[in-house]
Amino acid sequence: WFYVEKSALNWDYTGLTNYYGTWYYVENSILNWNFTGLTDYYGTKYYVENGVLNWNYTGLALLGSDEWYYAENGAVKNDYTGLTYFCGRWFYVEKSALNWNYTGLTNYYGTWYYVENGELNWNFTGLTDYYGTKYYVENGVLNWDYTGLALLGSDEWYYAENGAVKNDY
């Protein structure tokens, strides 16, 4: 399969092309059945699987060799910020891009989770600071029922009530 433009092969073209309602990934004018990942087409990133645009795909997808984005229904959703599940792990996405630098809390369907370096950390138990308030996290989940002493870092103890440190103690 070759990409023809104005009755001639265009060896320089790499991108998507529509053929009878199906979108295919073409690389240097040749259909690339081995390509799986994201491609940019007129400013929108689309998910291609085995050379064909997959409109049913939702999840993380790779652009190039090191950029991960959140795609929904085959296209990158630029306004999404939150968690996404991929290959058995949960990752933090900010404005559709996986953010390896984020450490803090994030709300996902009403539950607050602790993210460390872009990945949900199920092993974390202790206090974390979120917008000036310290919250108690247990096994990666904010525990609103916790009341008692809690450790921040390696040597700072605070009293938490209902999952948050009260500054008036």
Kindly give the residue locations of the regions a language model identified.
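Extracellular adhesion/carbohydrate-binding repeat motifs centered on closely spaced tryptophans
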Residues: 1-169
